[in-house]
Regions:
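S-adenosyl-L-methionine-dependent methyltransferase catalytic core, i.e., the SAM/SAH-binding region
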Residues: 1-310
Length: 310
């Protein structure tokens, strides 16, 4: 595959369709990455439109800054995490915005750089931090957490059925030598996994440790809990997820905003007086076309959900 294609943002047409209602408004790309989605959004904004791009990875910020140079008067790039969006916007004296986008997938400069430690396909340090400012690495988790906690991580963040066996083997191996490389971790997983199931098990375990290292699900939930108050009426929320744990959080959150009633089903009418705050724009999850998957294989597991503030 052409290297440039690895930086191609996913579901671009769908993002634009659901996100931009007011081209003169203020939009947030909470997962700036290399600036792919932001570039497409900025191309469609009017002169009064603005975009705030947020990322906590210095490499991503530098790549995005270069890519978005032509729009420097309309884009503001901030280092931070979307979980802190309220504070980030408040620092810019912004109360509400017209649209927020999150693309929760890994960028190629995470996956393809062995030194970042995100992939089992090459040997590198067990890092997995999205931000170098974070103190705890994947090696710290695998070397210090208890066997029961490791099993919990593999099961709950990776949905891995062999969670206990893998955790037990991690602990056994680290008693001999501290786990510091992806090769060590990969060999441990392989040692307790049938050959035919190794790829999926490796993917699940690496996902689990990455989520634990970066607090990804906690950050997503924190963002969701504040997102409603940051959106103007008729503003849009668009989220692209890449695994079932993220998608489940988003789906359940949107369902609660669309139908917040807590009354017992046997009551003939609502008495709790809780009103919907959002309207679903995607009744079914939006996935990439066959053509897009052919061009960008990493788009194949992407799922988009969108809603409008009411």
């Amino acid at each position: 595959m052409n290297k440039d294609l690895l930086h191609t943002p996913v579901l671009v047409d769908q993002v634009i369709k659901y996100l931009i209602v007011n081209p003169s408004g203020i939009f947030v790309d909470g997962t700036l990455g290399g600036g792919g989605h932001s570039f497409e959004i900025l191309k469609r904004l009017k002169l009064g439109g603005r975009l705030i791009g947020i990322d906590w990875d210095d490499v991503a910020i530098e790549k995005a800054r270069q890519r978005l140079q032509a729009f420097k008067n309309q884009v503001l790039i901030k280092k931070g995490n979307f979980a802190n969006l309220t504070e980030i916007l408040a620092a810019e004296k912004i109360d509400k915005v017209d649209g927020i986008l999150l693309d929760l997938g890994l960028s190629s400069f995470h996956i393809d750089v062995p030194e970042r430690g995100f992939s089992y396909l090459s040997d590198g340090p067990l890092d997995m931090r999205m931000s170098k400012d974070s103190k705890r690495t994947a090696a710290d988790i695998l070397s210090n957490e208890s066997e029961s906690q490791l099993a919990w991580i593999f099961y709950n963040y990776g949905e891995e059925r062999r969670s206990r066996a893998i955790a037990r083997t991690v602990v056994k191996n680290r008693q001999q030598k501290r786990l510091e490389t992806t090769k060590q971790f990969t060999e441990i997983i392989k040692s307790v996994t049938p050959y035919s199931q190794r790829i999926k098990t490796l993917s699940r375990c690496y996902q689990a440790v990455r989520i634990a290292t970066n607090g990804e699900l906690d950050n997503l939930q924190t963002f969701l809990d504040q997102s409603i108050d940051l959106l103007h009426f008729s503003a849009r929320l668009v989220i692209i997820s890449f695994h079932s744990l993220e998608d489940r959080l988003v789906k359940n959150f949107l369902a609660k905003q669309v139908n917040p009633c807590e009354c017992p089903p046997e009551l003939p009418y609502c008495v709790c007086n809780k009103k919907p705050t959002m309207k679903l724009l995607t009744r079914k999850v939006v996935t990439p076309s066959i053509e897009e998957i052919k061009l960008n294989k990493r788009s194949r597991s992407s799922k988009l959900r969108a809603a409008e503030r009411i």
